[in-house]
């Protein structure tokens, strides 16, 4: 029976040695990660969601000329937010619109510009390695072809876009080895077109 305590002691010793060999982040890195984790603001995220909802509808086929209603207004506001965030970090973000004309599809029968907004934070050591955070801009009611009715889309997917904006605000204050792409995608409810267009670029 004396072998059992010895076996248990040996197992514990081996486990502690294995744990000691696992590399841990240096204290400075741990402090940065703690700061990042504590930085998101529920108030800012809610304000962004409410702003996106205020455009009435963000349907892919909706109004693009108005500055207060439709997907065009939402796109311009998101682009401006990315630019504002970039200005606060000394131009650390490349803000671009990526789009294409889609037509002849069941949910996009007529020629329609599907435009997504990207903010790219280039990596310092491995810029060809990408991490992408995205939310889709567009919203819809039950009838996927109804582009005039209000479709606030707070949970599908204004909160995803708001989370992406908040991530850009926080992470752009730091430098990372790889590249981070913050993306607000259009045309997702009509067939994931925004993501496809961005991936093709």
Language model: regions and residue ranges:
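Bacterial N-terminal signal peptides
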Residues: 5-16
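Extracytoplasmic/secreted proteins, especially bacterial periplasmic and envelope-associated proteins
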Residues: 28-35, 40, 44-47, 51, ...
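A non-catalytic alpha/beta surface segment that caps or lines the substrate-entry region
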Residues: 36, 47-122
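Loop/turn elements at helix/coil->beta-strand transitions in domains of secreted/extracellular proteins
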Residues: 43-47, 89-93, 126-131, 176-181
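Solvent-exposed loop/turn segments at secondary-structure junctions
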Residues: 57-60, 101-105, 124-126, 137-141, ...
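Acidic/histidine-rich catalytic neighborhood of metal-dependent amide-processing enzymes
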Residues: 108-115, 141, 146-201
């Amino acid at each position: 029976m004396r072998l059992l305590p010895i076996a248990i002691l040996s197992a514990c010793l081996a486990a502690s040695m294995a744990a000691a060999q696992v590399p841990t982040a240096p204290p400075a890195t741990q402090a940065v990660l703690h700061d990042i984790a504590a930085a998101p603001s529920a108030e800012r995220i809610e304000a962004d969601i409410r702003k996106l909802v205020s455009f009435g509808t963000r349907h892919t086929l909706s109004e693009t000329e108005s500055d207060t209603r439709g997907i065009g207004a939402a796109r311009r506001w998101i682009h401006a937010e990315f630019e504002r965030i970039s200005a606060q970090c000394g131009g650390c973000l490349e803000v671009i619109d990526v789009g294409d004309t889609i037509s002849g599809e069941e949910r996009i029968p007529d020629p329609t510009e599907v435009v997504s907004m990207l903010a790219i934070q280039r990596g310092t050591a491995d810029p060809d390695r990408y991490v992408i955070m995205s939310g889709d801009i567009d919203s819809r009611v039950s009838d996927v072809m109804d582009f005039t009715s209000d479709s606030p889309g707070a949970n599908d997917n204004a909160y995803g876009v708001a989370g992406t904006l908040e991530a850009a605000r926080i992470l752009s204050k730091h430098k990372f080895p790889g590249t981070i792409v913050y993306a607000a995608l259009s045309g997702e409810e009509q067939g994931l077109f925004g993501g496809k267009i961005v991936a093709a670029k």
